[in-house]
Regions:
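Conserved catalytic or regulatory cores that recognize and/or transform ribose-phosphate-containing ligands
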Residues: 1-115
């Protein structure tokens, strides 16, 4: 099984990085291949185009996509859109609080429930 992890990269906090690393370690110990953009995508890209292209390939190749959602991560929103367009199964890694009305938080929670 292959999993792509949507997550903050540039502005991820140390605490977020630790939660993501613990999640990745658990999956990899279980024999699951994890594509982790901070590790597996070359982040030296002056425009971000190649990063988005590499992440798209990782998402296409994944059996399912996991998300560590941080609403401040704009790159995560781009990856989320690609994942949605490809109709991939989505699993949430961290706690997401529902909001009143329409929001990405509510959409992600709904998406995961739909399986």
């Amino acid at each position: 099984m292959k999993i792509f992890l949507i997550c903050p990269v540039r502005n991820a906090t140390d605490e977020q990085k630790q939660v993501m690393q613990d999640h990745i370690t658990g999956l990899e110990k279980a024999g699951i291949t994890v594509y982790y953009p901070a590790r597996d995508t070359n982040q030296s890209d002056p425009t971000g185009y190649q990063i988005c292209s590499d992440n798209l390939k990782g998402i296409i190749d994944a059996d399912e996509v996991h998300i560590f959602y941080d609403p401040k991560s704009t790159g995560s929103l781009f990856d989320l859109g690609m994942t949605f367009a490809l109709k991939k199964l989505l699993r949430i890694v961290n706690e997401i609080e529902p909001t009143e009305g329409k929001s990405f938080s509510n959409m992600i929670l709904d998406w995961e429930k739909r399986g």
